[in-house]
Each structure stands twice: as C-alpha cells, then as structure tokens.
C-alpha cells in the first residue's frame, strides 16, 4: 500500500509537459553493438561490443581447445542460449551435425552469443529480425552456433565471414535476421544475415568493413545499404544476395539496391540508439532523426577509448531530449534560503516499469516519453572487447565482461590468455534467485538502487567508475607481469597469472556490490 501511495504522490507532484506517448511492446531480441576501427581508437585497438538485452543465459565458460585426430562430425544445437548451465539441456534441441576436419580448435569464451577466442577474433551481436517470410526453421544454424564454429576454427574476421557463409550455403540458416560485429586485431566488419525464404534451405548475407578511422553501431535494425561487391577489400556478400531479393519481390532490379530495405522490410535503417551514439561521436555531421537512413559508419571527431565505449553502452540519454525522466520534476525548498527549485524526483529512474509509466501517463498524458535506452535492466550480460595487433594474443585481446544493467554494473577483464573462470560464472541466474550465480551478485544492489535512484545513483556510479579506472590503470602492469612470467616460467604459468587476475578482479567487484546491497537495504529499512 505504501508503494502505491508513493507512486501516486510522485505523480501528483510531477510537472508535466504535453504529448501523450504510446509504449511499444518490449522487443525480446534487443541488443546494442558498437564498433571502433583501429585508427579511430585512442591506442590503436580494434573494438567490438555487445549488450545481450533479454532473458538469455548468464552462465559463461571458457571452452578449451579440442584436438580432433581424424575428420569427424560435430553436433549443432538450437536454444543452447537458454540453458541453465554448461551441461544443461533446458529448451535445447539437436538440429543435426556437420563435418569437422581433423586438427585443433581454438579456445573461446562461451557466452550466450560466443564472443572471443584465443587468437583475438571477437564478435558482438544484435538481432535485426527482418521479414517473417525469410525465416526457414528447417535451416540448421542459429546465429550463436555459427559464432561458436567460427570462433573455434578461425583467427580473422574475413575467414569467419567466409566460413559462416559456406556453412549457411551448405546447411541452411534457420534463425531470424541477425547482425554480427566481427573484429580481429586489424579490422572490424558489420555482417548481416537472413534466411532465404520458406522454399529454400539456405540464407542470404552481406558484410561491410568498418573503415579504420570510423565507428559503427548496430541496434536491432538492418543497417547495410548499398553494396559495391567489386570492392572486395571492403564488401562481401552471398552469391544470391541480389537474386533472392528479386525472386521474392523485395527489389525490382531497377531502383538502387539497399540491403536493409530489401531484406529488413522496414521504413528506416536506424533507431534512437544508432542516432544518439553516432550523433554524439560526430555531432558536426548534423544527423537528422527523421531521415530514412543514417551512414553505416561515421568518423568520430575525437579518438574513442575502450572506456568511452563502456560509457556509451551505459547511456540512458540523461539531460538530452530523449531523457525519459525529464518531465518528472518536483518542487524542492531550500531550508536555509527558502528558495524553491524544481528537480528530477529522486523516485524517478530511467528504467521505470511499464506499470509505473502507465500509471504516470494515466494521471497526466505525456508525463513519460518512451525511448529505447542503450542500457536496460533486462540485460543478461554485456561485452566490450579490445584487440591489439602490437601485442601477443594472450594479452592483446581483453574482454570486459559485465552482468545485468550495463549502467549499474562493473566490468571484469578476461584476457585471451585467461583459461578458466570462477565457479560462480558457470551458473545461470535467469530461472530463479541463486546466490551462487554471478549475475545475482550485482542484480540485488542494482535493482534496489532503482527504488530511489536519486539517492543511490552517485554510489552506483562511483563504484562503476572505480572498477573502470582500476582495470585501465592495471592493464599495463598485468601485461608486464605476464611477459616477465612468460620469460621466466613459460606460457602455462603466464596464463595461470592472467586467470588468477581475472578471478581476483571478479571477487573484488562482487564484494563491492554485496556491500552496496547491504547499504541500500539499510537505507530502505523503514520502507521504500
């Protein structure tokens, strides 16, 4: 009852602006990926990233290299991204098997959408849906299985794209439209794929290289536009990319072919997230939100650091025209001067539930606008991956892994040379509370913080920044220690050091967020 009264009091005190908003259904496939070319970054790193913004598994493991003495076959699965553990089978089904050549696979980090291997090949992902008529469930591959095979077998982005294209042609693609942001230590590519339609087990895809001095963004909408397939250094596509569009009536063969328009079927090639991020990195371009499409990439007006990508993935548009709390203001009286000011209510937060937003808008239409934020509370995990051509693979590639809301959680460094993760990483936290699952180590404090975000925000932000600074500050030291151990004791000992560092860093973040949770419980001891 107190909670309901609090909401009503907040609503009554709000200073509203006009303009009713209808809230759309939450896209269950929502994700965001930012790419940075090596000449656009502050230190020459190639960067890719991913926010996995839905009810996907939170368990993560590092899969070791597998030695195949002879040619054989390996199984391909569906829905492994919903399993409760590495050995679990909940909702998972066997789709078939494919040829596996003799030889060794590469070690890789097995997130719901596998993200990095030991050779500094890395991937981000966003579901771009596309036309329903293109989906053929008889195709063998879901996108995450393509990623897994590519990370096990490939060391460069181009090779990964070629291999996935070959697998799609031979075995078929059975998923909705997907985008992968595929990076290695030299370059990053924007790859989009769709099914070939109900009558064909195959697929259609295109890939565009992000210029070295540019950045790109994918956020659940097809983005690839025109294709210059004569420029083999910067464009790749399936052989049927034009044929399928004409056959299915998506392109008349006369107007300029735009991949996003043919296969996506939408009216625009971007959303608020692409617009906000690109506009923030290249404001002088004057990008227009009401345009039909934006450039796939832009040249940033300053060098972009790994830390800035982390910050962009934490965006809630605070202070901008897209700020969803901008109308939720209350009058505050200064106790000393008696002056009255209006401020954002401490009870307002960017992640208000649908019920809360609907209540506020029922009391006064237009109280809360609806924009899809970059950082959302339903995020399972997120990645920012930096790759360096001037460093050995073991320490050149770093996955900065976060769980739960990217705007509220710390990031844990996992190096290419890290060979295992603490036990708490292996337990999914999506099917109930489990104190042993790493996501719940952060989720408790994060969710409590939103009860009165105005009072807790600074504490969360300070903790996030502390570990961001710690990771950046210690990165050079860790690499130096690795090199010293490598020279004195060999690679196995050096990798053990990296593995221990990841575990220690994770432990420090867990303790900090457990302390925050206790602090917030004390803060709200008398009620919310």
Predicted regions and their residues:
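Positively charged n-region of N-terminal signal peptides that target proteins for export
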Residues: 1-4
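Bacterial N-terminal signal peptides
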Residues: 6-15
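A contiguous strand-loop segment
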Residues: 22-142, 163-309
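Second-shell loop/turn segments in exported
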Residues: 133-137, 145-154
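Glycine-rich, aromatic-lined ligand/substrate-binding cores of catalytic
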Residues: 246-390, 394-395
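Substrate-recognition/cap regions that form aromatic- and gly/pro-loop-enriched pockets
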Residues: 346-484
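Histidine-centered catalytic/metal-binding microenvironments
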Residues: 468-528
């Amino acid at each position: 009852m107190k909670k309901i009264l609090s909401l009503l009091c907040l609503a009554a005190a709000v200073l509203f602006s006009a303009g009713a908003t209808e809230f759309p259904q939450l896209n269950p496939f929502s994700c965001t990926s930012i790419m940075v070319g090596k000449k656009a970054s502050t230190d020459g790193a190639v960067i890719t990233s991913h926010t996995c913004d839905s009810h996907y598994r939170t368990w993560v493991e590092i899969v070791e290299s597998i030695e195949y003495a002879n040619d054989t076959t390996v199984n391909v699965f569906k829905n492994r991204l919903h399993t409760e553990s590495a050995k679990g089978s909940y909702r998972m089904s066997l789709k078939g098997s494919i040829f596996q050549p003799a030889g060794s696979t590469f070690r890789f980090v097995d997130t719901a959408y596998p993200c990095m291997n030991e050779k500094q090949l890395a991937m981000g992902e966003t579901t771009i849906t596309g036309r329903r008529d293109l989906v053929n469930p008889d195709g063998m591959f879901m996108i995450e299985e393509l990623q897994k095979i590519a990370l096990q077998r490939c060391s460069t982005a181009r090779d990964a794209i070629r291999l996935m294209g070959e697998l799609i042609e031979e075995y078929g693609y059975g998923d909705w439209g997907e985008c992968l942001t595929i990076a290695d230590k030299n370059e990053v590519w924007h790859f989009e794929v769709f099914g070939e339609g109900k009558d064909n087990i195959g697929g259609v895809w295109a890939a565009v290289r992000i210029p070295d001095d540019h950045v790109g963004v994918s956020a659940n909408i097809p983005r690839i536009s025109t294709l210059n397939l004569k420029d083999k250094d910067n464009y790749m596509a399936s052989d049927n990319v034009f044929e399928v569009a004409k056959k299915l009536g998506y392109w008349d063969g006369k107007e300029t072919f735009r991949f996003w328009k043919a296969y996506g079927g939408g009216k625009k090639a971007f959303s608020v997230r692409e617009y906000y991020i690109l506009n923030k990195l290249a404001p002088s371009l004057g990008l227009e939100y009401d345009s039909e499409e934006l450039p796939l990439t832009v040249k940033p007006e300053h060098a972009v650091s790994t830390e800035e990508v982390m910050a962009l993935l934490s965006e809630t548009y605070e202070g901008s025209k897209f700020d969803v709390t901008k109308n939720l203001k209350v009058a505050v009286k200064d106790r000393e001067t008696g002056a009255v000011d209006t401020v954002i209510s401490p009870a307002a937060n960017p992640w208000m539930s649908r019920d809360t937003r609907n209540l506020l808008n029922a009391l006064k239409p237009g109280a809360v606008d609806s924009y899809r934020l970059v950082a959302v509370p339903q995020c399972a995990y997120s990645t920012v991956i930096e790759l360096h051509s001037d460093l050995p693979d073991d320490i050149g590639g770093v996955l900065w892994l976060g769980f739960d809301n990217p705007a509220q959680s710390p990031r844990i460094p996992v190096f290419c040379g890290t060979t295992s993760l603490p036990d708490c990483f292996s337990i999914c936290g999506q099917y109930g509370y489990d104190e042993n699952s790493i996501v719940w180590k952060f989720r408790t404090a994060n969710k409590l913080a939103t009860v009165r975000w105005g009072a807790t925000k600074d504490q969360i932000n300070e903790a996030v920044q502390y570990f961001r600074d710690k990771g950046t500050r210690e990165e050079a030291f860790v690499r130096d220690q690795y090199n010293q151990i490598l020279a004195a004791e060999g690679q196995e000992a050096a990798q053990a050091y990296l593995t221990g560092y990841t575990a220690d860093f994770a432990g420090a973040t867990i303790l900090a967020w457990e302390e925050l949770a206790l602090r917030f419980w004390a803060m709200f001891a008398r009620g919310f």
